[in-house]
Amino acid sequence: DRLYFEPLSAESVIEIYKKENSNGKVLGVYVQFGGQTPLKIAKQLEKSGINILGTSTEAIDLAEDRDLFSNTLNELKINQPKNGISNNIDDILNIANHIGYPVLVRPSYVLGGRAMEIAYDNKSLESYAKTAMMVSTNNTILIDKYLENATEIDVDLIRDSKGNVFIAGIMEHIEEAGIHSGDSACSLPPFSLNKSMENKITKWVSDIANKINVIGLMNTQLAIKDNALYVLEVNP
């Protein structure tokens, strides 16, 4: 085994791949173990001739593209908070007013909850949106109805190419929904979920993994408000 201390960029990975491939055929690379950064460069790696192991770039897009993912949840008849997506300030304000405040605003394809904020009116939303657009890959902003006082749930699973799903853990956040998972504490096993809700969560995340055709790891973030379950996002 070898360990490389290099920037996690397409250029660095391609150079390392070429070097390793010269010593013997490399089957491909996994992009599921480093958060958003490797997911963002997956298509560049694939275009350069590198085989992406595990979840395909098409499946990654199904999870990461808000419109595609929203349509997927609708097809599965899975609840999601009211939401919209835009790269125009006026449209963002119109979407928020249609959804109803408070809203959660965040840029697409970023890691660590960067520029994620809760807006309670047009003035704060406009300010947050401008900041979020600066760090978004394509100036695209996601606007979700913020579920106040909701319980947030994190689920990690593994799925193989034959469709077998193993739930690694259902974790219940100590803080209410809206605090980024990297900044919050959680309980494993969950401390307030009944068996019926756990079964529903298990079915939903398994259905999503099968629909998207995840091969390998998948993280799902959900919220429970007034005993209703919602899917917030999926990270393959």
Give the residues covered by each predicted segment.
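N-terminal beta-alpha lobe that positions the nucleotide/phosphoryl donor
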Residues: 2-220, 224-236
